C-alpha cells in the first residue's frame, strides 16, 4: 500500500488513489460481491458497489459496524474536508441523495436507498454474484 506524503505531487496522489479504487473493485468482483456489470460501469452501479463494501464488514469479527449517513442516502459531496475552515463550507452543505435532492431528517428512514442499506447491514440483502 502506498503511503501518501504531503510533499507528493497531485499526479502521484491521484495515481495512488486510482490504484486503491482499482484494487477495491478487483477484490469486490473476484470475491463475488459485485456483478461484472457493476465493475464495468461503476457510475451506473454506485449503490450496488457501496452496499457491497458495507456487506463485506459483516464478514469481519467486529462487534460494531456503522454506515455513514452520506453513504446511506447516496450523497456525493463531502460534508466535511478537514483543514479547510475557510476554503470549503464544512457542515453547511444540506444532505442530498444521489440525484442531488435535499433529504430532510423526516425522510431519511423512508428512503428506499436507506432501507436497502439497512437490510444489507442486517445481513438480509447481501447478495453475492458468483
Question: What label would you give each PLM region?
Answer:
Residues 3-130:
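Catalytic cores of glycan-processing enzymes that make or break glycosidic bonds
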Amino acid at each position: 500500500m502506498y503511503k501518501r506524503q504531503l510533499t507528493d505531487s497531485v499526479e502521484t496522489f491521484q495515481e495512488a488513489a486510482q490504484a486503491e479504487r482499482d484494487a477495491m473493485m478487483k477484490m469486490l468482483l473476484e470475491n463475488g460481491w459485485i456483478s461484472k456489470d457493476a465493475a464495468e460501469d461503476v457510475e451506473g452501479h454506485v449503490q450496488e458497489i457501496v452496499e457491497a463494501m458495507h456487506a463485506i464488514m459483516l464478514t469481519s469479527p467486529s462487534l460494531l459496524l456503522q454506515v455513514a449517513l452520506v453513504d446511506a442516502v447516496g450523497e456525493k459531496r463531502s460534508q466535511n474536508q478537514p483543514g479547510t475552515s475557510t476554503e470549503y463550507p464544512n457542515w453547511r452543505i444540506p444532505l442530498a441523495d444521489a440525484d442531488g435532492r435535499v433529504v430532510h431528517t423526516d425522510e431519511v428512514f423512508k428512503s428506499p436507498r436507506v432501507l436497502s442499506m439497512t437490510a444489507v447491514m442486517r445481513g438480509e440483502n447481501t447478495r453475492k454474484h458468483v
